[in-house]
A protein has these predicted regions:
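Active-site-flanking segments in enzyme catalytic domains
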Residues: 3-19, 23-267
Length: 267
C-alpha cells in the first residue's frame, strides 16, 4: 500500500490516503497490518543476526517502522483517521526535505555490537521492545537526532532513536558520536525512569568537572549525562574516531567511562 523511501514520503502518502473519499476501515486495518508485519520481519532478522535487542535500518523499512511505533490502533474509522491526521501534521511540522547526506549505518552497527560485547548493553539497558535506530532519509527542523522514549503502565520502557540528515555546515560531529549521545539518553532513562532527570550520584560525581551541574545547571544534567556517556565510550581503544570532545583530558574521559561501566554492570 505504501510506496515510500523516507519520512517525508511517509507523510505525503498519509496525506493522500486521508484525502480519499472512500477510505474504509478495512484499508486502514490493512495498512496497519503491513507496517506491523514489517516490524515482525525486522525483529526476526535481528534475532538471526544475533542482536535481538535492536534494529538498525533506513529507507522504506525505517519509515514503516516509524509509522508502526507511532500509530496506536483502536476505535472507529473516524478515530483512526484523526490519529493518522495528527501524526501527519506533526511530521509536517518537524521534517523537511533531505539534505543529500547519506548516513552510513555500518559503523553504527559496529558500535552497537561493541557495546553488547563489552557491556552487555542490550541485555542490561534496553527494554523488552527492540530499540529502533531509524535513519529518516530527511532532515528535522531542529535536531540531527532524537531519542524517543515510551513509558508503559508497568513502568517498563522502550526507545527509538531517529537520525536525520544535516546541512553541510553541521557535519563536524561523526554519526558514531551522535549515536553514542542518544544511547546515553537511553541509559539515563533505564537508570532513572525519567529522561528529563539524571542519577543523583552522577550529579555528585560530575560536579568537580562541571561546577554548578547539581545546582545552577541541574536542568541540563540529562544532556551532560548523555555527553559524558558518549565521550567515555569514545575513549576506548578502537572507538577514538568518535570522540567529539578533543579538548577534555583523556584521563577524565576514562573516569566517566568507568562510571558508566559500573552503572551498567549494576543493572
Amino acid at each position: 500500500m505504501l510506496s515510500i523511501n523516507n519520512f517525508i514520503e511517509l507523510k505525503e502518502n498519509l496525506e493522500i490516503l486521508l484525502a480519499e473519499q472512500n477510505l474504509s476501515h478495512e484499508l486502514i486495518s490493512g495498512l496497519h497490518d503491513q507496517v506491523e508485519h514489517t516490524l515482525i520481519m525486522a525483529a526476526n532478522e535481528a534475532i538471526i543476526d544475533r542482536h535481538p535487542g535492536w534494529i538498525l535500518c533506513e529507507g522504506r523499512r525505517a519509515a514503516e517502522l516509524y509509522l508502526c511505533r507511532n500509530w496506536r490502533r483502536g476505535g472507529q474509522l473516524e478515530d483512526e483517521k484523526t490519529r493518522l491526521r495528527v501524526l501527519a501534521e506533526q511530521m509536517r511540522k518537524d521534517f523537511i526535505a533531505a539534505q543529500n547526506e547519506r548516513i552510513d549505518l555500518r559503523p553504527l552497527e559496529r558500535i552497537m555490537r561493541d557495546l553488547d560485547e563489552q557491556n552487555h548493553f542490550t541485555a542490561k539497558v534496553l527494554g523488552e521492545e527492540p530499540l529502533l535506530i531509524l535513519s529518516a532519509g530527511c532532515s528535522h527542523r531542529c535536531f540531527s537526532a532524537l531519542c524517543r522514549p515510551y513509558i508503559y503502565q508497568d513502568d517498563s520502557f522502550s526507545c527509538d532513536i531517529y537520525l536525520f540528515q544535516r546541512t553541510a555546515e553541521d557535519h563536524g560531529t561523526s554519526w558514531g558520536s551522535i549515536l553514542l549521545h542518544e544511547l546515553g539518553h537511553v541509559l539515563n532513562l533505564r537508570l532513572t525512569g525519567d529522561i528529563s532527570a539524571a542519577p543523583d550520584d552522577f550529579l555528585s560525581f560530575a560536579e568537580p568537572f562541571f561546577p554548578g551541574l547539581s545546582t545552577k545547571y541541574r536542568t541540563s544534567a540529562p544532556e551532560f549525562f548523555a555527553h559524558c556517556f558518549a565521550m567515555g565510550v569514545a575513549s576506548r581503544p578502537g572507538l577514538e574516531r568518535y570522540d567529539a570532545f578533543l579538548n577534555i583530558q583523556n584521563e577524565h574521559k576514562q573516569l566517566f567511562d568507568a562510571y558508566m561501566r559500573s552503572k551498567i554492570a549494576q543493572l
